[in-house]
Each structure stands twice: as C-alpha cells, then as structure tokens.
C-alpha cells in the first residue's frame, strides 16, 4: 500500500523548494486568481497548473497534474467536503473531464544483476548494465552491458556502440570511468574511488560479484521493480524541462557573477521577456500523461515497439485507469499493472511463490488482462529512492568502525566480506563477524536497504522501484535487539537470505500473520468483519466476490441523498447500509415454487432500496460562421412539470429546450437518443432539442435539466435525466460469499418474523448454498417462526443471517455497448459470458464427446471398432467417459 497523496505532496514541495524555487499557480497569465470550484474545473476539463519562477516566467506551462486531496489541491480548489467524502476522490486526477488514476507499474529489474539468455551466449548467463558516460548536452546516461558466463568464467561486454567483445584487463580503465560517475547515485560516488592496485583488479572484482548464484528467474518478484506514479512524474518533469532549466539558470548566475567580479555593467540592451519558456516541452509532458505513457521515462523499449508495430494496439499503450465515482476506498495507490512485451504467454503472467504477502492472493483483475493487474498487500511498501540517506548510513558504518577501505584484493583477510553496492564493486570491506551489527545499523527504522551475502561478498542494494514488506526482526548476539524493518522479496522468501541464515546474521523474522496478510487494504476495508471467509470457502468464490465488488453500483445513504452520481446508483435506508458498495439484508435459505432455480433470489416486496439512473447526454453542434462576426446565441431551457411525454413504444420524450442562433448550426447526432427540430425565424435559426429515455416499471422522474456551453465554434447542449424506481426485478446481486444471482419476483416475507420484529428480506436457494460450499460462521443470526408466533413451542425455528450484498444493473444501453459494438475475434474474454471461442470449444467437446465416440464406434455396423474411433479415443488427454 502506498499513499499517492503523500507522494505528490512531496513532489510539489520539491518543485517549490531550492534549487527549483518554482511557484505553482492555476493560470500563469493570472497568478493571483482565487480557487475554482469543481464545476468550473470540470468545464476546463483538465485539472493542471503552471510553475512560475521568481521572474514570473512560466517554466512548466499547464503540465503539472494536480492530484485531488493534496495540499496543492486545497490551495487551488474551493472546498467541497461533502462531495469529496461521498466520492472518495483522494489520489485521483482529472484529464479530458474524466477522473483517472495511474497504477503502480511493475517491470523487470534492470538496475541489478539478473539472469540472462541470448542466442549469442550460453544458456545460463548473468547480465548487468553499468551506467555512466553521461552526455550533459543531450541528457543521455549511456550504459555498457556486461554478460558473465559462469561455466567458462568469461566476461563479455557490449559497449555503447553495440560492439561485442570478450573482456580483458584492458577494460579496467573503462570500468573505472563508468563506476566512478554513474550519474544515478551521485551522493555515493565516493564509494567508487579505488586505489591504484584496486583499479587494475576491477574486472576480477566484477567477475567475483557476478559469480554469485541467483536463485530466482526473471518472472519472480525478487527480479521486479514497481514504479510509483509520483516518481515517474518527477522523472518526466526533470528530464523534459527542469534539467535544462537548472543548467541555464546556473549559466546565467555564473555569467552575472563574472561580470560583477570584472566590474562590467550588465548589457543595457534588454530582450523581450518570454512568458512561457518551454511551450513545446510542456505540451510533450501533457501528451505523455494523457496517453498514459509515463513509463517511457525509464524504458525506451516500449516507444521502439510502438514505432515498429504501429497497427498493434497492445494493452500497455495507455496505463491510465478511468474511474467512475465514487472510487473504491484504498484502490488508488494499491493497484499494480504488470508491463509485458508483445509475445505474452500465459506462463509469463502467473504469479511465482515470492509474490505471496507482497501481491494480493485473491484479486487478480479483469479476465481480459488476467495476471496483469493486481493489488499490493496491506503490509507491502514502495519506498522512495533516497541515495543521500544511504550515504549517511555508510558514514554511520564508518563512524562505528564496521567497514574498512580496500586497497588490494590480494591482501583481504579470510574473514572479510567485500561490500558491493547495487552489484557494483566498492572500495569498502567488512568483517563477517560484524554482519549482525551492520544489519542493525542499515535495516532499523524501516530503512529501505536490501542486504544479501555470499561466501566473500556483502551486497547492499538501494534503487528505484523497490518493493518491501513491513516486518519485525529479532537480532541476536552481539546486538540483542528487535527492529522494525522493510524486507524485500529476496530477504523474506528465499532460504539463502541473510534473514534465514541465523549463523551469519543472527536474525529471525517475528511472524504473527493470519489470512489478512494475503489481502490488500481495499479487501480488508470492505470485508472487515468477514475475513474468515477467505480461508473457509473456495478461493474462486472469493475472487468472484471481489471482481463484483469493483463493478457494483455505488450505495448512498437515502436520508442524506443530494444529487445522485452519474450512472447507476442505489439509495438505501440507514439500517441496511454497510459501506459505499454493500448493503446488509436478512437472508433466509428457502425456495418457493422453484423460483430460486438457476440462482435467482426472492426479495421482499418492500426492501428499503431505490435504484437511481443519472443519465447525461451531450449533443454537439458546429456553428457555420461567415467571417469573424460573433453570432448571437441563446439557450432557453424548458421548465415545469409538463416537459416530457410517454410515447406508445414505452419511451419518454423530454423537451430539453430551444437554441436560438444567428448562424446555422450543424448538429452531430444519430437520431436515437435525441432529436433536433430546426426552423428559421427571420434572421435567426431556431432549434428545438428533444431527448429520449426508456420507461421502466414504477419509474419516477426525479429531475430534468439542460444547459448549453460554447467553446469557439462548438456548441454543446448538455442534458441530465435522473430517474428512480423501487422495482428490483432483474437486478443482479452478489453476496460476500461469491453467490451470484438475479432478483426474481418479490414476495411478502414478513411472515418469517423474529421475536424482535425483524423479518427475512431475501431468500437464497438451498441448492446454491450447498453447491457453493458457503458457510454462515460468525455471521449475525436470528431465528424466525413462520407466522411470527414465538409462543408456540412446537413451531419450527429457522435461522436468518445478516449478509452483505452488492447490486448491479444492466440497462439496454450497457448491453448494447458491451456486446453489439465489439468485433469478436475469438481471442478476447468478456467477463461473465460464454462468447469467446475457447469456451465454445470446451463446451462443445465436453457435451458431445461421449455421443460422438459412440456414434463412431457403431457407425460402421461391424462388430469391431472402426479406425476413426481408435484414432479419436487415442487423442483424448483427459476424459471422464468410461468406455466398455
């Protein structure tokens, strides 16, 4: 779990502090303007701000994304506490009028050494990139690639010009250059200043480091890094604008000082001040954010792939996630997307053993991207990269005499461990006996530094994208202390880890976990009192419940209901409200006239639930302007109770209003959702706008509203229709047990009455209850008697259970969008359907196998089996048919 708001608060503070000293304002042309309300921000469509320097030049022009809930948001937006609390906006941002979140992104770890296979080399090699050779002009940090073949003990190198060669001692000088100025961890450059003898031994030192066995494959979490949104945003701003701006500001300052020293007056000729310094670069930043391609800051591979395959629309092209309000609590910041290349195979996407307790074990995202979207467990942490902090830690080790300098590898003591930082050779060593003390100094206070050890090397790692888990560690003699530590997947899961080798580190992880350690904070919040279900009922049912939780209609409190959110929502009574996605209903396991066959539920005829549908339509038109004359334009919205009428086909026609225009308007619409009647009145064009919506049983029209906006020559008429109904028949429900079904015809369930007056509110199928292996342990229960006569001792008592449910609704529009507007290729998987080719084939084979074989066997009317039967029966890998 990571806090997006805290991360972005830190980013904004960094922009406003030295050396940048920028001032964040909503508009660079009006920096003193007051805060805007949310409606005005939605009209602007994008919630971004500008960054001004002390000369009031705009350095970052409308490209700094403002995240809702941050201190900057509180400064730029008028307070709307009720709306924020109801919709849980915290951590989201707005672009193109849509609320979006950016997931944490998982990639392969190219910072450290990793297993590597290439046709040019042996099958089991190790690879490492050495960064350096920084080109300050082009802001490029080049890298040479080192590949080590353990079998032959040979080191190969590929330089920045893509030339391959076997490494000899001649490379020592080049290695020193790359290691001494990596450009990535400048506060630690002093670790890579070697003695004269050591400089001649760097190749051997690197071979020693790369000879160490890595016991994880490329798909393991130990070989992954997870980038946070704020870090990628900072990289984008720095690489695109800030790096160049700082360099130019430094040059100007140096020139000013030189002129002052020489006594020369500054040039009298003044150039015209430029208000926006980096217009094109700012536009590039906005495009990167809008297209969800922040990951390109750290990986150029994806941009190359897109250029190579322009027609291929992969799932990685846009990582922004559009979020419908209200947002699931604790979703933002916990969600992780795994980036994969074009040749995605199912085995690449499965989770390895070291994902446990770091990545949620129950929520695996949508079927379309199975294995690529998941959630961080509650105890997982994504720490910030801080090389200055690591430099302070090394200074602390030197202060306590726990490390010593290396002058010559040949003169190192037998009990000494050479220290490597991020798998690079350093000029330090330590004693093996001091490892427990070093662990204490480097790991305490949840310091995000990874420690590994081999027979002669202590690996100290700290880099971007680390993923850790918060644990308590007990360190024995000579330290004898317990510390709060952050452990990486390697440290926590692998038997070769220091924390599973007490003879070396004297460490022991203190464990007190239950099933909640496998769950994200989102799951723990929504299933707070029902976590026991995760280990008492089948896991697939819990996955169903979690998937449906994400897709469920928002649940609102009826007593304080203001404007219903856009789309479908549910308003409920206070006594059945559980959270913003669930309602609690008293459930009785029974059937009536087979009404619960095929999974339907029987609801009570008067449930305290009302469905709301807030439908927004935008009718767009273009003014046919002649010259630069501004046309007269006016919109008169209709009012009163008689502005809608029911048509014979059960549709409702709503008269939205009249547009009066001095110029002709060309409207873009299909005539299905809305209708425009046009006529002329003298020099004016008159357009009457009508909107259609579907009529349902017991429907009440809550509100009808219309408005018009003008942007350039574009006219937009926006209509909002809010309807509600208490008819729940056909609404899909899902319980916390993963029991899906639809609501059937309602019955009067007040005859099933408890002593305190509580009655059953919904009936669950007895067959479904048994077949799904559900249980009602630890659920609130009461006992009811049919008819409510509890004085009768012979009357049978039946238990009812207070079970949370999620509700869904499919309108004809949603069904049309989901099914009819898609081109099926046979490769996609639409959740909850059987439309894909794989499922069709499985179903056909399963249902037809037995009769097909029987038909083949008897088809020839001969006593012996025909050849076709023999062939087909031999091809069956798995079959549940008994052949006699």
UniProtKB/Swiss-Prot annotation:
Swiss-Prot/TrEMBL keywords: DNA-directed RNA polymerase, Nucleotidyltransferase, Transcription, Transferase
GO cellular component, one term: DNA-directed RNA polymerase complex
GO BP, sorted A to Z: DNA-templated transcription
Gene label: LEF-8
Catalytic function, reaction form: RNA(n) + a ribonucleoside 5'-triphosphate = RNA(n+1) + diphosphate
Protein family membership: Belongs to the RNA polymerase beta chain family.
Protein name according to UniProt: Probable DNA-directed RNA polymerase subunit beta
Organism from which the protein derives: Orgyia pseudotsugata multicapsid polyhedrosis virus (OpMNPV)
Superkingdom field: Viruses
Known EC number: 2.7.7.6
MF annotations from Gene Ontology: DNA binding; DNA-directed RNA polymerase activity
Purpose: Required for late and very late gene expression. May be a component of the novel RNA polymerase activity induced by baculovirus infection.
Enzyme class: transferase
Family annotation (InterPro entries): DNA-dir_RNAP_su2_hyb_sf, LEF-8, RNA_pol_bsu_CS
